[in-house]
Structures are given as structure tokens and as C-alpha cells.
Curated annotation (Swiss-Prot):
Protein source organism: Methylobacillus flagellatus (strain ATCC 51484 / DSM 6875 / VKM B-1610 / KT)
Entry GO terms, CC: cytoplasm
The protein, known as: Aspartate/glutamate leucyltransferase
Classification lineage: Bacteria, Pseudomonadati, Pseudomonadota, Betaproteobacteria, Nitrosomonadales
UniProt keywords, alphabetically: Acyltransferase, Cytoplasm, Transferase
Keyword Glycoprotein recorded: no
Gene: bpt1
Chain segments annotated as transmembrane: none
């Protein structure tokens, strides 16, 4: 199977996975379209794929390919047009004391400990087993594209790690994990604001945030960053006119 689009993708083939349980919408099956062979998915090829709605997990580039559901919408932020809300400006001011370091992808016990604590807090009460070091490595440490880890520290203490990909027209936020112990912190918001600022300093027009699903509260935070574009029917177009209102 091939996809229409950019010329440099002509050597890449695509196959659909078998159905599996959706991780975001309960009781719904899901399928993905996988780009292959993996060694051809370099920074150049991935820059084309991300514009077609693909994302990266380890060495795999994929996008949703569900027969009866089209809830997953790839979203990106036009950097030059971004308008922070009042709460986002507060988050920016609150965490400006964090020191930031860009490092190559590599396994770190310190990173894995923070990741494990983050997963435990986010999936409290879940019957799923904790992720192993191997699963973590496969997910976040392996990449065939231009990827970096962004470390955020406060007085030398690791508070957050953001894994990102650099593509032709922007930065793609792959995954972020942070210290959940401080209930008054806004690390996730600050991470997106910092990445937007970094995009601007590199003259990159877009920050890619992955998929947004209207019915998923886990993804509702993405709607708070405006203006925003979504890939709908093969075309990037403006979506969301209002920020997410937390249900009372």
C-alpha cells in the first residue's frame, strides 16, 4: 500500500495492523497504519509523514486507521499566531526558574524513575503492570529521526523531561513526563509554552502536539492552546474557537 503525497515517500510502504483495544475510547477497537521499512523513516521522510498525520513511537511511524471511527485529529499550533491565556501566562511566570538542557536520546536511571512515578500517578488504580526498562527504551530512547530530550530542573532536581522530534517545518512533542507531587505546578503547560518559544527562536512555524480526541478528557488540555490547526480530510485547517471548560 502506498500513499499519495510527497515524492520522497515513494519507497515507503504502509500496512494496517490488526484491531486492538483503543487506549482512549473505552470499548472501541482501533487500528493503525504503519510506515515501513523503519530504516527509511529518517528525518527527511518523517517531515513528510508528519504533515500527513503520522506520529512516532520509538522507531515506528504510525497514524490511526480505524474503519468506523475518525475521532483522532492530528493538531498543531501556528507559532507566530499563538495567543496565551491568562492562566498560561501565569504558568510561564511560575516556572521561569527552571533550568533547561537539551540532550541526546539516552537511557538514564533518573529519567526512568521520574517516568515510572509519572505513569503510576497517571494510572493510579490500574491493573496494568508497570512498564519495564526495555519498554521505556523502545518507546522513548530509540529513534531514526532527529530527536532530543529536554530536561527541566529546579535547583538541580529533575522536574520534567520532554522528548521531541525536529522536523522540516517545526517541532513535534513526542511525550512529556514530570513530577506530579507538586499539585500547584503547571509543568505540562509550561512545557508547551517553552517549546513554542523554542520554535520561535528557530524560526520554525509549527509545534505538533499529536492527536486530539473530543471525547477524551486526557487530551482536553490541547484545546487550551489557540489558535490551532487540525488535519481534517487531508487538509490542515483552523479548529477550536474556545478553550476547554472543565466540567463542574
Amino acid at each position: 500500500m502506498t500513499l499519495p503525497g510527497e515524492q520522497h515517500l515513494h519507497k515507503i510502504q504502509f500496512y494496517a495492523t490488526t484491531a486492538y483495544s483503543c487506549g482512549y475510547l473505552a470499548d472501541k477497537p482501533a487500528q493503525s497504519l504503519i510506515a515501513t521499512p523503519h530504516h527509511l523513516i529518517d528525518a527527511h521522510a518523517y517531515s513528510g509523514l508528519i504533515q500527513l498525520g503520522f506520529r512516532r513511537s520509538g522507531k515506528f511511524a504510525y497514524r490511526p486507521h480505524c474503519e468506523t471511527c475518525h475521532a483522532c485529529i492530528p493538531v498543531r499550533l501556528p507559532v507566530a499566531e499563538f495567543q496565551p491565556s491568562r492562566s498560561q501566562r501565569r504558568a510561564w511566570k511560575q516556572h521561569r526558574n527552571l533550568s533547561v538542557a537539551l540532550i541526546e536520546l539516552a537511557f538514564s536511571e533518573e529519567h526512568f524513575a521520574l517516568y515510572s512515578a509519572y505513569q503510576a500517578a497517571r494510572h493510579e488504580g490500574s491493573s496494568e503492570d508497570p512498564e519495564t526498562v526495555e519498554q521505556y527504551r523502545n518507546f522513548l530512547v530509540q529513534s531514526n529521526v532527529e530527536s532530543l530530550m529536554v530536561e527541566f530542573r529546579e535547583n538541580g532536581v529533575l522536574k520534567m523531561v520532554s522528548v521531541v522530534d525536529i522536523v522540516r517545518d517545526g517541532i513535534s512533542a513526542v511525550y512529556t513526563f514530570y513530577d506530579t507531587a507538586d499539585k500547584h505546578a503547571s509543568y505540562g503547560t509550561y512545557n508547551i509554552l517553552w517549546l513554542l518559544d523554542w520554535c520561535g527562536s528557530l524560526n520554525l512555524p509549527y509545534l505538533y502536539l499529536g492527536y486530539w480526541i473530543k471525547e477524551s478528557r486526557k487530551m482536553a488540555y490541547k484545546q487550551n492552546f489557540l489558535p490551532q490547526e487540525g488535519l481534517i480530510d487531508g487538509e490542515w485547517r483552523p479548529i477550536h474557537t474556545e478553550r476547554y471548560a472543565q466540567p463542574k
